[in-house]
Swiss-Prot record:
GO cellular component, one term: endoplasmic reticulum membrane
Disulfide bonds: C389-C392
Protein name according to UniProt: GDP-fucose protein O-fucosyltransferase 4
Alphabetical list of PANTHER family matching this protein: ALPHA- 1,3 -FUCOSYLTRANSFERASE, ALPHA-(1,3)-FUCOSYLTRANSFERASE 11
Protein family per UniProt: Belongs to the glycosyltransferase 10 family.
Organism: Homo sapiens (Human)
Record topology, Lumenal segments: 25-492
Enzyme class: transferase
Pathway this chain belongs to: Protein modification; protein glycosylation
Membrane topology: Single-pass type II membrane protein
Purpose of the protein: Protein O-fucosyltransferase that specifically catalyzes O-fucosylation of serine or threonine residues in EMI domains of target proteins, such as MMRN1, MMRN2 and EMID1. Attaches fucose through an O-glycosidic linkage. O-fucosylation of EMI domain-containing proteins may be required for facilitating protein folding and secretion. Also shows minor alpha-(1,3)-fucosyltransferase activity toward activity toward biantennary N-glycan acceptors. However, this was tested with a library of synthetic substrates and this activity is unsure in vivo.
Gene name of the record: FUT11
Amino acid sequence: MAAGPIRVVLVLLGVLSVCAASGHGSVAEREAGGEAEWAEPWDGAVFRPPSALGAVGVTRSSGTPRPGREEAGDLPVLLWWSPGLFPHFPGDSERIECARGACVASRNRRALRDSRTRALLFYGTDFRASAAPLPRLAHQSWALLHEESPLNNFLLSHGPGIRLFNLTSTFSRHSDYPLSLQWLPGTAYLRRPVPPPMERAEWRRRGYAPLLYLQSHCDVPADRDRYVRELMRHIPVDSYGKCLQNRELPTARLQDTATATTEDPELLAFLSRYKFHLALENAICNDYMTEKLWRPMHLGAVPVYRGSPSVRDWMPNNHSVILIDDFESPQKLAEFIDFLDKNDEEYMKYLAYKQPGGITNQFLLDSLKHREWGVNDPLLPNYLNGFECFVCDYELARLDAEKAHAASPGDSPVFEPHIAQPSHMDCPVPTPGFGNVEEIPENDSWKEMWLQDYWQGLDQGEALTAMIHNNETEQTKFWDYLHEIFMKRQHL
């Protein structure tokens, strides 16, 4: 992970690339009533939402300054705690205008004990229970931004870990500021035309498989390689990347793993030749959906998907994805793919959503329409600044409620703090990609790594919760608490 100053420079440099790459798709789509065609980013830049560690904007959200809070010294402070993550440049503090009023966003940790600091904002990948700011002050909320894979921090997948936070912004629709569709810029992205059938037929005649697998992140909690390895016994799979590789991408530039998650035109042209894409997420959580799902649909391929158990809720219609878990075995899945590969009429039914009026899922349409943040859209805030304002508005409401209660306790109740719930991550214990966990040897690398990591996250969450309840001030005591919890669990 890059050092803090480098990451801040990346934040600034990314602003221009985000704006430059976003001018065609979503804006044109709104002007044409949602029916515009998607235009690829002119420079082949990566399609992804502005990363918390990469490209973010610095535009302020609009809002009307509230009377009596004009001076920055009177405004509530939001303290970004994760090193290098601060969606403003330059300086350490920035006044932000939000819907309910103004706050001051800061990254200066010296503000931690200031009475005006009302909220700490944490980035989930960086959050470490052993380094949490203690003691936790009663007047401060903790806010969590975690749009990335749960494998980065399994502490957050357990009740004791997620309930440390008051406000959340995660991939789950149940979080306070949901980012479920962070990888989907709009409906126009899904409507990209399907490649000519003759082009794909020629590709097959040249000996290529019907099914593509492109992964370089191996040995993940979802254990996807174990399933794909078994599937390969029943149907040809062209596997690129570092995982189960049996073919190489045509150029060294495309072989670079940094290119594999981009909208590079040459890469997209190559991938679009395949009728089916194996799309397996690195972890299984409700609403956790990445480019592995949306990019094949963009390219006119059928995703063969395993990931979010709730994925059907988000699909453009009820016949646009093949779900691995609908089949009792890899062999049965292979037989079905082979059937579709040989029956164009049945295959094309999976791409009907690309036709005018083909996107019939009103929940998907409404979710895209009503989200207040955009994906590479200069007319909308990115989700970092959006969540920041969400926290600001919450703190302003909390301040008003506290003042009202102080002035008239009988008429205004005590403000009840909001507490995050396990559904805000919703990630169960990892299971094998194929077979039963009891059948896997104890020295299997997946079993040794991910099962242990998952349950250690529970212990860490319980340890930090106990430290907060005991009003501990020394972070070094965390390991004593963790050891005590571990020993108690061993004797259960």
